[in-house]
Amino acid sequence: MNISKFFLIFIPLVLFKYPANNELINYNVILKYDVKDLFKRVLQEQNEDIKDDNDENDEGDEEDEYYSYLKNRGTNEFDKVKYKYAEYVRFSIFKSKNIYTHIFNELLVFLGAQYGTEEEIVVHVKLIDILSLLFTHYKDNLSKFGHILNSFQDRSKLMNSVENEFMNEFINERDNYIYDVKNAYNKSDNNDDEWIETVLNKKNMLYDKFLKEWRIDGSNFYSIHNKKKTYLPKKVFQNKQNYIPDFENMEHVDLVCKPISDSAIDEKSAEKYEDKELNINEQNEQSNSKKEQTGNDNVSETKMHKEESSDSSNKTDESNVCKSENKYIKKTNNNKKIKEERHGFIYKMRNDFFLSDASLNVISLINSITSNEENKIVKKLYTGLKKLKITTFDNLIRYTNIIGIFFSYDIFDELYLQIKLIKEYFGLIPRNNDELSIVSKSKNVSKIKVYGKYNITDDEMFVPPVCLSAYCKLRSVWMQNRDFNFKIEKYSSNSINFMTLGDIGRGFKKENSYDEEQMLKLIGFNELKSTSNAMKDWHASNNADFVINLGDNVPEVDELDYLKNFEWHKIMRELFTFRKQDEDEEKNDADSYSITKDNIQEFYKEVEKQMNNTNTDDKNQHNDISTTPINNYTDGNEGNNNSENNNGFREYINDNTKDYNIYKNETTEKEETYDSIPFFSIFGEKDYFYFPSEQIQEHYAKRIPGYFFPNNYYRINYDFVYNNKEKNGVQEKFKASFIFIDTWSLMIGFPIIRNYRSFREQFNWINKALLESAKESDWIFVVGHHPFISSGRRSDNYSFEELSFHNIIRNFFFYYNIDGYFSAHDNLMEYLNFGPLNLFVNGSSSRVLFDKSTILGRGYFGKMVGSIYPVTCYLLTTIHSALRPKGCDISKYSKWSNKYDIGFSAHKLSKDELVTEFINSRSGKPVSQKIVIKNKKDKRRKFYDLDGYTNDKIKQFENKIYEFSSKNPNFIKYKIEEFKENDKKLNIIMNNLKSEEEKDAFRSLMFLNNLIFGISSHISNISFDQLKLMCYLANKYRTFFNKKLIKFLGEELKIAVQKMEVKTTNETPHNSNEILNTNENESIQPNDPTMKVEQIMELIDTLGYKPDEFLEKYDAMTQEEKDALKEKLGNDVSLEDYLSKVKMYIHKKKLSAEELKEYEENEENIKIAEVPDESKEDDNTNSQPEDTIDQENKDDINDIINAPNEVHKNYKELVEKEKKLTENEHALLMLSSLKTYDEMKYSLNILSKKEVIKEEAHPYGLYYIEKHKTFFQVSLELCPDIKRIISNLGKVGTKLAFYDYINNLYNKIMDLKNSIDKIAIF
């Protein structure tokens, strides 16, 4: 360790700490002043909380500590109340205004430290304000931004920024849970609850207003009452003359006077009328300032009118006839000057547009970019940042948490979704009637199903009315579609045939000419097309029923510019549409799927023609805007909208009297009818970087035949029927469930806020889906993107020992005994066995091993590199900067793997087995042997047949008993003789007991003595007094009772005593030990600890004997000698009590160390059990006089107790062997003996064992997460793959892909702005 390094850190920190904090506090006040409008309501609540704290000082230290903790955490508005109802984000700044303090902090960061929390300035703003700040003031710098890091320590700063957002979410979850629990416990009214109710009421009102105007089908929004042209945006220039006269204060004007430009007034009146239907979004606050200025002018002029009218006396001076005209002309000129100073424009939308109630609104963001006057909050925030000299995007990244915000919130997905929805609604996406000629188009005609209000549950947060974004509104439809049933009936095959593949996004590349394609094919660089063609060939010969896509469906960022001309759904239609075949079709139909030179050239000619037509239409349309009348353009726009969904709803939109469940055509078919086989899909982590909602949206748009992705997690149930013609129509039936999960969400991947809050809803759904499938299905398969384990390069990123994700998945997999788990992510093909789990990894549809490499994972280069794996995994890490030495060790669980071929897996599922083969995409031939796994339905029997499952377990248990008894006959004989001897002695003891209560308690002990299972069920109804007496008798005659029974009774008695203490404490303030203490003067119990052994030994010494000799002499004493001894002891204590103490002393000396320890543990039970019954009167509590007890019977009992066990003498070896038995072996010994000795007791044990098995197999799943309790299930750290992605972002001096995504988002927003500009009304 370098001591000088720590010295450099510590000494300056001490010297500069006070001035640094002082400077920070001063500037923090300045920054708050700059954004005082934002904090106005916050400061008011803080002052109210201070008053409340002064009034509640008497409530206790615990409450004061809790509220002070909440107060110290930050602003009450954003931390104390439930954050999920607020629309604000936490924007943190880590930079001091003082130059010396800043240099000192930079030195600490360079030495490896992080920016301290005392340097943090927190501002709570809306997310759209952050984006406006970025795209308005830092966009030019962002587009030229080449790298982020000036030092390797800044890389740690980048990681820390994201981790802070993750931890903030964890802390919010925890604190809100504590806050709810305290409120529920205290049952106190809280102002925050009123605030929450107010916010929810407002959101409910907005949502109800939305439902009155709009309906959703999961893909688009449809207006009920208005046509599309009603919602066309209005373009308002900032410098446009827009003055409207004040008619109320206008003086009477002589009609002879020349009026003010009538046409201008009419136009402005029309604009005023339209302004009633349109509204400016939140960020256009310049209009408010304009109104204030105009209002002030009107007020002053009104006063002038009144003064002039009071002085005038109905004069008709010609100079004053046009006075009002001159005045209004002057005001109009002044208004022009104000307008001329404002450059830019804004777009106004109707206040009932489907995005008007969204906090993050892309139209508002466009207005912030195009308008000269920006949001006041953004302007003041930027002013504060400039004072801190944060003027470049590099500074913004290094000294704020803006990257953490991008990782935490779904900015990309929401804005891309809004852009697409707006473009599709207004028909701004050009389409051809025949988009792709190669792919057979879907012939089925189905209805559009639209949805109304969605009923939110406690676990759901990203649905209305809590959330009003476009994503949340669409998700309210998606959440209703999570379970689907399909039926397959065959007569030529007894199996369901399906294929799986993963990581298809890496294969989406720019198309080339036919000759170039042939050249790439020669070197193997046509991976995805090869996989697609091989799958279609397999489908043609085996008639596949469906395909499973395992995630990572989007291309690299450098391909996005090219792919935006095609749209994602068109490429999916080309490559992954598999025509549905009938069983009667011939198997040689594979030729219909082959791609020839002619149809490839024809396809690209169509694409090129389409792109050219699009560019031409855009130019013509842009040129026609200024010359074409608005009405004609609007009609033309509607006529050119060729969207399938919009055409289907055209009749519905125009005629508002019809129901909104409108069919596309009068003749319809069932929704379940497909011309293409289903193509089921899920998300990978790369999909969350770009636009994940588009993939779900395309399911409802139905533009990709067979494409199936209704929600980010869902379940598919297949009912299969095989009609065997050879066996006269005998049917073979089975049911298979495929559960598709979002593994990235379970890992709390980015966007962190969305996935963290939706974690528990998916967790509970998985538990429910698995439970239902275990009851109903013969097969259960789980489908997810990330592997449980693998031997690939990323294996240590997802090691099952590290992540909470794998703990959760492992618990589900083992508990429900699933039949298989399909995954991808690692670019290889592999089959693994992890205990009883069957794991399939298939992520090599387009790359091998190195997914990001341009050469090493592609073509025959990848085949060569992968063939010598894992040697290359180590060697190439020193050559290629993108590689990491991860997963280089071969997994010991791998049964088969292929790391050098691209391909997919083919499966045939029958009633009893699943047969799997991995197929090489280039050759179309299997590269693995047939992998056969058997059905595990019998292991899931406890879920669908609990009684049958229990009976099977009992049969297995009885077989073990039989095996044990057959192997140990002498052991069984010994135990039976011990039972007989003990029962004989116990019967004698019971007959000599004093009272009926003791006899009843002793009978109960004899009944429970040889019970091994379910003892608690037999003593649940026993009273406390009887339990206490049973415990006393069991300890007194402990040599004849089962040790477990004595221990169990002692524990139950302790629990009963604790309950009694709680009850008495609540009623009266008694001492907690009062129930155990008795009056020593009333009675001295035998075995009382106050009777010390030393006193007994002194007494024996006075007699001149040793303890052993004393017992022998006592047996030989006459009655007179015993009476004399009793007189010497005194009448208060019986002689038998002293004798028992002596015997106990001798017995302890003979015990081993372990036996002595066990004996001492039961001393406390003896003390508790010997407590006299206080409910009886004092005269009944004392024992009967000694002279009234039959002395002969007492002597017999003592003889029985002290007599050595004859059976133990005869079987010494077996006694020692019994002590070494395990718990299970001892139970087998007891039951084997009871089966012969006492069949009734044996049957009772078997029945109790059944109940134990049922309780252990109770089919209620693992556990359910309570409200706001997710932090108990998730990891405290980011998942390793998030860290890997962030580490890849943190390379010094390189262009980072993440910032290309931000630039691409800005370009998309500007593209939408240009498209809106074509249809906007001036």
Swiss-Prot record:
Domain of life (superkingdom): Eukaryota
One record GO biological process: peptidyl-serine dephosphorylation
Q: Its catalytic activity?
A: O-phospho-L-seryl-[protein] + H2O = L-seryl-[protein] + phosphate
Basic and acidic residues compositional bias: what residue ranges?
Answer: 267-279, 288-326
Quote one Gene Ontology molecular function term.
protein serine/threonine phosphatase activity
Report the cofactors.
Answer: Mn(2+)
Keywords annotated in UniProt: Hydrolase, Manganese, Metal-binding, Signal
Segment forming the signal sequence: 1-22
Q: How is the cofactor bound?
A: Has weak activity in the presence of Mg(2+).
Q: If researchers knock out this gene, what phenotype do they report?
A: Conditional knockout during the mosquito midgut stage causes no defect in the parasite development with normal production of sporozoites. In sporozoites, phosphorylation of eIF2alpha is enhanced. No defect in host hepatocyte infection, however, sporozoite development in the liver is impaired causing a reduction in the number of exo-erythrocytic forms (EEFs) produced.
EC numbers, comma separated: 3.1.3.16
Keyword Ribonucleoprotein part of the UniProt annotation:
no
Bias (Low complexity): 631-646
Ranges for the region named Disordered are 267-326, 613-646, 1066-1087, 1170-1196
Region span, Interaction with phosphorylated eIF2alpha: 1-535
Entry function = Protein phosphatase which dephosphorylates 'Ser-59' of translation factor eIF2alpha during the liver stage, thus enabling protein translation.
**What name does UniProt use for this protein?**
Serine/threonine-protein phosphatase UIS2
**Organism from which the protein derives:** Plasmodium berghei (strain Anka)
